[in-house]
Amino acid sequence: KISSNVSVFPTEPEADPLHGWLRSMERIRDTVPDDVLVLPAHNEPFIGLHARLAYLGQGHRVSLDRLRRRLAQPRRVVDVFASLFGRAIDEPRLLSLATGESLAHLNYLVHRDEATVSVDDDAVAWYQAV
């Protein structure tokens, strides 16, 4: 199934959109009944909102765990694509989506002091787990 793309955009390179997205899922779960008819932008309508929210949240937690392990050594954004998406991103049309979503996960860890970012002399950002 297609899920939301939670991305950092060039206008806010240090943003933490994943945190806001995860919190909004909690608020939705706490305020919207499970038995509402969900009309997603992609795929078919369904009932079972809370299960879908749990599934999406778990997917991001698993991705963050894989990312933490990958960051045992310094990595660039492009170096973590396979950890987050399970494959190389070799289609130009997907590169900006993958970069933005990878940055969202990296920034989430940086904002929680679970990773650091340093910029080298060539202006390349390198991320590493703390």
Regions found by a protein language model. Give the residues of each.
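Metallo-beta-lactamase
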Residues: K1-L64, V77
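C-terminal regulatory/interaction regions
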Residues: R66-V130
